[in-house]
């Protein structure tokens, strides 16, 4: 009886492997990721362009919103849920904030009710959640200034390594020099500068800096986590002309595997970004345009409730 039971278990495992091949994810990392982009036919607005893209090799499906931040009719904001549990879907964000384009924002604790943001959440010059200043990894405490995405009311975008002190935000021109087993045990604020933004959100790691790929996994203490691996992704960046680039890539699907951080950085560079940052990914990665979900988060048409988002709205 015991042998028969074991044989049945083996048969079930074989069937699962055959029926669900995505469980055996392609872990190869690609250095060239050509994507064929085409503009989506939707209710077009000046200053907002929505493209969908496909790469058949990895394979991946991707969507990108390109925002002209110099357009006076466009507002770019970090928004946060005011529901009792501090979470809502992107479609709800879109409706409640009258936003044309919405993508998910920073990390949050899904097991908390109400949920809590992981790191800085700064909206309309008010701190909703303080900057993450240190964390424990391998029984050691690391002080870190993680990557943050910031917006000014005039439309300017910035990406920097950010922390806070006495209710003020500070950025470091270079990341705090953490590495595995070599923690930095305090901040040297003499190396920092005041970060003057109106909205900001911690996420990370930074993917690009000064026009080059620079993924600060170790410095931001993402080593030893699942963040660098292949996942559905959301990323933000900006071009030399100031245009904001918001990217969403589906993953965990037969026809869209997702990407690792290096692949994500390559795609953002190919989109002409000079600075870029990884945002919350996995089942949270989604883009809503005119109130409609345009991607398939983790292969479904349902939306995960998230705490924060980036919203593109038209001024009345």
Task: Describe the function of each predicted region.
Residues 25-167:
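Zymogen propeptides
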Residues 28-52, 215, 292-316:
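Flexible, D/E/H-enriched segments
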Residues 180-187, 195-223:
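Short, conserved active-site entrance elements at the starts or edges of catalytic domains
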Residues 100-104, 150, 158-159, 207, ...:
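Structural recognition of the beta-strand scaffold that forms the well-ordered cores
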Residues 112-137, 218-275, 284-316:
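Conserved, well-ordered active-site substructure
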Residues 60-64, 146, 202-204, 231-235, ...:
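Short glycine-rich loop/turn motifs
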């Amino acid at each position: 009886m015991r042998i028969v039971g074991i044989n049945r278990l083996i048969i079930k495992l074989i069937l699962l492997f055959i029926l669900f091949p995505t469980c055996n994810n392609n872990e190869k990392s690609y250095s060239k990721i050509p994507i064929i982009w085409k503009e989506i036919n939707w209710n077009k607005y000046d200053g907002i362009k929505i493209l969908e893209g496909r790469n058949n090799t990895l394979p991946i499906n991707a969507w990108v919103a390109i925002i002209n931040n110099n357009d006076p009719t466009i507002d770019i904001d970090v928004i946060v849920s005011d529901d009792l549990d501090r979470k809502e879907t992107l479609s709800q964000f879109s409706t409640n904030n009258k936003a044309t384009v919405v993508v998910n924002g920073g990390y949050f604790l899904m097991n908390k009710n109400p949920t809590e943001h992981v790191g800085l959440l700064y909206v309309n010059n008010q701190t909703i959640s303080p900057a993450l200043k240190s964390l424990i990894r391998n029984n050691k405490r690391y002080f870190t200034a993680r990557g943050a995405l910031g917006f000014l009311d005039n439309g300017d975008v910035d990406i920097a390594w950010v922390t806070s002190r006495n209710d003020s935000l500070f950025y470091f021109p270079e990341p705090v020099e953490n590495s595995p087993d070599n923690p930095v045990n305090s901040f040297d604020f003499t190396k920092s500068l005041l970060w003057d933004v109106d909205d900001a959100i911690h996420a990370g790691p930074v993917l690009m800096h000064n026009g080059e790929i620079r993924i600060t996994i170790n410095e931001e203490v993402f080593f030893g986590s699942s963040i660098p691996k292949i996942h559905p992704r959301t990323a933000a960046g900006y071009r030399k002309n100031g245009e904001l680039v918001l990217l969403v890539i589906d993953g965990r699907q037969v026809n869209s595997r997702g990407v690792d951080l290096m692949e994500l950085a390559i795609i953002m560079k190919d989109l002409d970004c000079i600075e870029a940052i990884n945002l919350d990914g996995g089942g949270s990665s989604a883009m809503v345009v005119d109130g409609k979900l345009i991607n398939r988060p983790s292969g479904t048409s349902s939306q995960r409730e998230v705490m924060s988002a980036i919203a593109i709205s038209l001024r009345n």
